[in-house]
Amino acid sequence: MKCATLSLVLSMVVLMAEPGDAFFHHIFRGIVHVGKTIHKLVTGGKAEQDQQDQQYQQDQQDQQAQQYQRFNRERAAFD
């Protein structure tokens, strides 16, 4: 009986809320956020990590190339 009363009172509160309160919008936004997070974990998490790894490797190669060029310039200046 208490559960029935509670559900009736809560439904009345929801129905009496003004559209500006955006109660349903918050619930919908939360559901969408959870769905996107789950989708990212299932499909996109691996691709994002691979992209970060690839960027890190490219940065390392660029840094090595700059060091090699600097070394060659210093060696040429020394000769």
UniProtKB/Swiss-Prot annotation:
Q: Which residues does UniProt assign to the signal peptide?
A: 1-22
Q: Record's GO cellular component, any one?
A: extracellular region
The UniProt record lists the keyword Glycoprotein: no
- Propeptide ranges, please? 47-79
Name listed for the protein in its UniProt record: Moronecidin
- Return the similarity comment: Belongs to the pleurocidin family.
Entry comment describing in which tissues the protein is expressed: Expressed in gill, skin, intestine, spleen, anterior kidney, and blood cells.
Query: What UniProt keywords are attached to this protein's entry?
Result: Amidation, Antibiotic, Antimicrobial, Antiviral protein, Fungicide, Immunity, Innate immunity, Secreted, Signal
Q: InterPro entries under this entry?
A: Antimicrobial12
